[in-house]
Structures are given as C-alpha cells and as structure tokens.
Amino acid sequence: MKLVLNNRDEVFDGNQHTVSEIFKIMNFTFPRVVVKLNGKLIKKPQYHETIVNDGDNLEVIHLISGG
C-alpha cells in the first residue's frame, strides 16, 4: 500500500491499515497529535477504527508545548 504521510511517499505491506496500526509501524509515540486523513480531522477515539487505504493522504502533526 502506498500513501502520503506528512508530505512523504511511504509504502506499507497490505492493502489497508488503521491509524493506530500506522502509528505502531512508524513508532509514533507522541502524547499529543492532530491527525488528518484526506483533509478530514480524525479524533483519538477513532484511531483504532479509521481505515487508511492505498493512495490516501495522512497528516500527523506532533504538538509541542513550552514556556
């Protein structure tokens, strides 16, 4: 499966994965993120059920706070 992840072409085994599976494959462990799939905001409770398909555009924005 090919997709655009954070403006980079990525290739994964299989035809589809959930957002949570992509996080695990990519070792994303950020505590606060904003996720958009094909321009649509995906809320954290939906990560396990939201399917990412071949050709999709997935954006994972890591939020950082500081003082």
Could you tell me what each predicted segment is?
Residues 1-66:
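Ubiquitin-like/PB1-type beta-grasp interaction modules and other compact soluble beta-rich domains
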